[in-house]
């Protein structure tokens, strides 16, 4: 009898829960429309559901009428966006994840101390753009080990490194090792920049890979952490698909042998995961569903003060 092993934790992290609540509570408090700069989180199901309730998603603040409210997404923004919002008399509400804010704060602090900052991340990702925007003259982004070899800094340059919060633990280990080898005096945060949810989801998946022959990651193609989960499996030789809907499941899975693991990115709603479980169960008669608990998460982030109940 084949098994479907469900990784835990999976799906929504506390930062995503908070960001969605920010939009929902704002809509309840002030009514539609509420403008949101960028997708609040990188998941089409979430974005479409909020759009149906009256949220309007924009990439540029010029598309927000003067004087309206605008919410910043969980990924964070550069200071230039806040300045533009102020100039246009927008009422801004910040849904940036607290762990992303921690990385912003570290960048500003160490730049003020005279350090050159190396940011491990994907240059075009909105989170990285926001961090770089804090102190652009101090930050250099590296995406791979080869970028470390091309860095122009001398051995006596004060260096500090941080990372995008949603990266592969494997990639960060490789790149940070290369940084330490080239610059032994480089320093970083006492605790990792990688967020707890990214770490837990990757480690939970790693822990079951020896027991399965296939992996499904439920998440959006635009979700960094969902893509990294798929890479965790592929890097260890286990075939893996990134799916956003039950319809994305290849019906040929019935012809595969062995057990299957399923996890979900940090912005994936649990109802989508459950729909995917039902689809697999319909394709594979007698499929046994087993929960594998790697960690229990209890992190909760408060809503912005303007949205808290008085």
UniProtKB/Swiss-Prot annotation:
(2E)-4-hydroxy-3-methylbut-2-enyl diphosphate binds at residues 42, 75, 125, 165, 223-225, 267. InterPro entries: LytB/IspH. Pathway: Isoprenoid biosynthesis; dimethylallyl diphosphate biosynthesis; dimethylallyl diphosphate from (2E)-4-hydroxy-3-methylbutenyl diphosphate: step 1/1; Isoprenoid biosynthesis; isopentenyl diphosphate biosynthesis via DXP pathway; isopentenyl diphosphate from 1-deoxy-D-xylulose 5-phosphate: step 6/6. The keyword Cell inner membrane does not apply. It catalyses: isopentenyl diphosphate + 2 oxidized [2Fe-2S]-[ferredoxin] + H2O = (2E)-4-hydroxy-3-methylbut-2-enyl diphosphate + 2 reduced [2Fe-2S]-[ferredoxin] + 2 H(+); dimethylallyl diphosphate + 2 oxidized [2Fe-2S]-[ferredoxin] + H2O = (2E)-4-hydroxy-3-methylbut-2-enyl diphosphate + 2 reduced [2Fe-2S]-[ferredoxin] + 2 H(+). Pfam families: LYTB. Its cofactor is [4Fe-4S] cluster. It comes from the Bacteria. GO terms for molecular function: 4 iron, 4 sulfur cluster binding; 4-hydroxy-3-methylbut-2-enyl diphosphate reductase activity; metal ion binding. [4Fe-4S] cluster binds at residues 13, 97, 195. Catalyzes the conversion of 1-hydroxy-2-methyl-2-(E)-butenyl 4-diphosphate (HMBPP) into a mixture of isopentenyl diphosphate (IPP) and dimethylallyl diphosphate (DMAPP). Acts in the terminal step of the DOXP/MEP pathway for isoprenoid precursor biosynthesis. This is 4-hydroxy-3-methylbut-2-enyl diphosphate reductase.
